[in-house]
């Protein structure tokens, strides 16, 4: 299994993501609101930077990419619903079904700062440039315990206590950071997936303690109900309650592959979606124990 140790950015840390690097020639994905593209073709043409189940239409999966936000159905067909821009740090509001948050880059270059959508991703506005911004949050999470609290990483770990209007630096952030997830129990508890393992902070990111050591962890996700998911390389997808006391392995057999992004249907937690380092989108109807390619019938 190959792990590329470069800058603390998900697409550069993970060898599988680097293998699907996007060229300038691939920039114009030929789709608009009236056209569709198969997700298997979409993942060959762009990076996936985040997933979320559409809370107002749970049959749809929102896919944040290097070239815009797409909405995909169970048939595996996707359509772009936003303008063309690079969405990073994509995360849904934990309780408001219309709100989404992100960062990244506009098509013409530069940084977007902290941006929000109140129409399920169709239009976006900048809420704040962030601290020392405009920021480009590659990792971002909204606290399920207090949605006014948002964490993002740009030249350190930043925190907002007013839904992204103002930001302060909480600390340098963990070494080799890949992903962040806020706790459902406390706004000051934060989980970090890193090259060295899974970490937890109970003081809003000022200090960290290990939960999993000795293997890279490529994602961490916490549901509003308090179920923690993580992907441990060499082990597989694991889950635990909060606070985590032992991690249950719920699926393995990924070989040299691993999961990069995870989305759980808040209305039906058995429905789970994932993006792999090999550029595949997967779906599960048994809480991640078995998987099929998005667009294919579940067993």
Regions picked out by a protein language model, each given a short descriptive name:
Residues 2-299:
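Extracellular glycan-interacting surfaces
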């Amino acid at each position: 299994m190959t792990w590329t140790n470069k800058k603390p950015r998900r697409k550069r840390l993970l060898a599988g993501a680097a293998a699907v690097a996007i060229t300038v020639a691939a920039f114009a994905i030929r789709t608009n609101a009236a056209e569709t593209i198969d997700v298997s073709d979409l993942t060959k043409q762009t990076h996936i930077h985040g997933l979320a189940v559409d809370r107002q239409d749970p049959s749809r999966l929102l896919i944040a990419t290097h070239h815009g936000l797409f909405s995909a159905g169970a048939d595996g067909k996707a359509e772009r619903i936003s303008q063309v821009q690079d969405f990073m740090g994509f995360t849904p509001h934990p309780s408001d079904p219309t709100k989404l948050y992100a960062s990244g880059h506009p098509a013409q270059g530069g940084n977007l700062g902290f941006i929000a959508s109140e129409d399920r991703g169709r239009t976006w506005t900048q809420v704040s440039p962030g601290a020392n911004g405009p920021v480009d949050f590659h990792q971002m999470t909204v606290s399920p315990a207090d949605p006014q609290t948002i964490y993002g990483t740009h030249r350190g770990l930043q925190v907002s206590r007013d839904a992204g209007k103002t930001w302060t630096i909480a600390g340098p952030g963990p070494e080799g950071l890949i992903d962040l997830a806020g706790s459902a129990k406390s706004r000051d508890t934060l989980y970090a997936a890193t090259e060295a393992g899974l970490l937890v902070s109970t003081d809003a990111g000022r200090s960290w303690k290990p939960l999993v050591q000795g293997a890279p962890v490529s994602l961490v996700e916490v549901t509003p109900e308090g179920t923690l998911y993580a992907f441990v390389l060499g082990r597989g997808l694991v889950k635990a309650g909060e606070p985590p006391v032992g991690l249950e392995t719920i699926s393995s057999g990924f070989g040299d592959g691993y999961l990069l992004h995870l989305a759980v249907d808040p209305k039906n937690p058995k429905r789970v979606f994932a993006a792999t380092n090999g550029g595949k989108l997967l779906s599960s109807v048994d809480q991640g124990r078995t998987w099929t390619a998005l667009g294919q019938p579940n067993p």
